[in-house]
Amino acid sequence: MKETIRIIGIDPGLRRTGWGIVESLGNSLHFIGSGTVTSNAEMDLASRLCQLHEGLSKVLHEYMPHEAAVEHTFVNKDATATLKLGQARGIALLAPAQAGLPVAEYAPNAVKKAVIGVGHGEKQQIHMMVKVLMPRASFDTSDAADALAIAICHAHHRQSIASARRLQQLIA
């Protein structure tokens, strides 16, 4: 018997961390919610990270997902910005782990491939495909749309992982 799994996708960022929640039952995906947690740019880094943690913790408590997926960060030429993004990503990994959720991580190209079929694409393509895959999905920001794409990617990958485990059990 298949069970419904609620997944939160998280797109980490220091200014805005997007979140998107979907339910997966077999091949079926259902939109549950999405949004953005923000931090005040006028505050010190530690306070901003606390704001992100508190915001994500509230979302996790409200929606009670079963699993989490977080996007890997990319390295850019600005080392300071990359470091700050890495710290925000640490919060994105920590909050669901503290809530007892298994946390998967996906490269941006893997997310794009799962949602639009190729590893390279424009954000607009991703947002459009999120709406195609889940017509009831709504998102106010690009970060929330990206988070939904991350959740969709995890839903697809977790099915592959489960199938591989079943196959392994049959062979053993």
From Swiss-Prot:
GO terms for biological process: DNA recombination; DNA repair. The keyword DNA damage applies. Its EC number is 3.1.21.10. InterPro entries: RNaseH-like_sf, RNaseH_sf, X-over_junc_endoDNase_Mg_BS, X-over_junc_endoDNase_RuvC. The active site is at D11, E71, D143. Mg(2+) 2 binds at E71. Binds 2 Mg(2+) ion per subunit. Pfam families: RuvC. The RuvA-RuvB-RuvC complex processes Holliday junction (HJ) DNA during genetic recombination and DNA repair. Endonuclease that resolves HJ intermediates. Cleaves cruciform DNA by making single-stranded nicks across the HJ at symmetrical positions within the homologous arms, yielding a 5'-phosphate and a 3'-hydroxyl group; requires a central core of homology in the junction. The consensus cleavage sequence is 5'-(A/T)TT(C/G)-3'. Cleavage occurs on the 3'-side of the TT dinucleotide at the point of strand exchange. PANTHER family: CROSSOVER JUNCTION ENDODEOXYRIBONUCLEASE RUVC. NCBIfam families: ruvC. This is Crossover junction endodeoxyribonuclease RuvC. It comes from Brucella anthropi (strain ATCC 49188 / DSM 6882 / CCUG 24695 / JCM 21032 / LMG 3331 / NBRC 15819 / NCTC 12168 / Alc 37). The gene is ruvC.
